[in-house]
Amino acid sequence: MNKKNIFYAALLLMAIGAEAKEIKGKVMADGKGLAKVVVTDGTAFALTSEDGSYMIDADEKAHFIYVVTPSGYMAPCNGGTPVFYKTLNENSHDFQLHRWGTVGGKYAMMAAADTQPRGENAFHRLETEAFPDLKQVGFEYMSQNIPAFAIFLGDILWDNLEMFPHIKQEIAKIQIPIYPVIGNHDHDKEVSDDDASAHLYRHFFGPTYYAFNAGKDYYIVLDNILYKGNKKYEVGLNDQQLNWVKSYLQYVPKGAHLFVCMHAPAYFYNCLLYTSPSPRDTR
């Protein structure tokens, strides 16, 4: 084989390796397929058919395949957080959801931010004060047949990421679903690459950006920390997320009530903090 043929063969192998991976599966609840559920890999999107089946060409760099949990449903929880995602390690991934409230019905949403326990005393206060209070409020709503969930808006820990298993155990004791958001202190400070620095967070909590529905409302969770390593970061949204949001908004009705959840403030007084375009400009 001459050098030219070797070169073309190498290009062909590179092209084949860069091809998207076809992923198939079903989204189910109560033994039946759920139609028109949005499925994504963090780049591309698909809608489930009438029998709940989907097919999506997953990006080769995708970490997960996951669903936009529809109104009236909830994914099973592990350590208190909904597992609406599957690690991309097979060609087929099914999802089992369960009923949670009613489609378009009432619900209660609570929010907490910057729990970031640094030492034993901080963990003790979370475990004996803050988390029990959150549980009590959630149970008060549920006693009125109003489903409840909470959103933790980042800095779940304070750089001590070896404590992720412990804090997940404590989150589970709240006994209501907790949707997580990644903060700057939830990144691995030893890693300077933004995507790679979230590896431990993804292991315990799943995607760093995603969406779900509750009642008549639409929620988008974003990672607006551009991590540089060694506790250094900028506030902004990378192009991958902005493109994902732009594509996702085609599934959100115009005029819908939309919540965007992220760790760092989007505005400080009259100053726009983003180093990247505003998500408002994606539609």
Please give the residue ranges for each predicted region.
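A short, amphipathic beta-strand motif
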Residues: 23-30, 52, 95, 275
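Extended active-site neighborhood of metal-dependent phosphoesterases/phosphodiesterases
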Residues: 71-76, 162-254
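Short, acidic Ser/Thr/Gly-rich low-complexity loop/linker segments typical of extracellular
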Residues: 40-57
